[in-house]
């Protein structure tokens, strides 16, 4: 079993797409359309590859939960990469700043970015294939 997709409500479809295209240049738009969701007409878009994707739904309003608080909701989601330096370079070149770096570990490096909707996304690169090292926490 694996996670197939995340469904995100966004404020601006194009700004969201721009951010994730910088992070995932090999992904593409798999499908898109319009639907009525509890009386609100909104556009949806699936962005990903053949195995996983993100769904964006526009007409989002309000603020995302503050990450410094303990409110119920998503804290962040993460993707594993084999080239963290390449990802960081693409994101910086596209105008996105690192929100913060992850904890120091001899077996992984990770950084966090905030997308245009204030979702926090972690990108992690492991330097070991051994589960006991990948799951080593100090």
Predicted stretch roles:
Residues 35-36, 59-61, 83, 104-106:
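Short beta->alpha connector loops
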């Amino acid at each position: 079993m694996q996670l197939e997709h995340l469904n995100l409500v966004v404020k601006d479809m194009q700004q969201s797409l721009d951010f994730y295209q910088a992070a995932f240049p090999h992904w593409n738009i798999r499908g898109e359309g319009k639907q009525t969701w509890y009386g609100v007409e909104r556009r949806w878009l699936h962005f990903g590859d053949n195995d996983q994707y993100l769904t964006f739904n526009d007409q989002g309003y309000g603020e995302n939960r503050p990450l410094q608080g303990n409110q119920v909701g998503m804290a962040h989601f993460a993707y594993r990469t084999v080239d963290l330096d390449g990802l960081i370079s693409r994101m910086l070149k596209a105008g996105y700043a690192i929100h913060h770096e992850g904890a120091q570990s001899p077996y992984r490096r990770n950084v966090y970015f905030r997308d245009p909707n204030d979702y926090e996304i972690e990108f992690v690169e492991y330097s070991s294939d051994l589960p006991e090292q990948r799951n080593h926490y100090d």
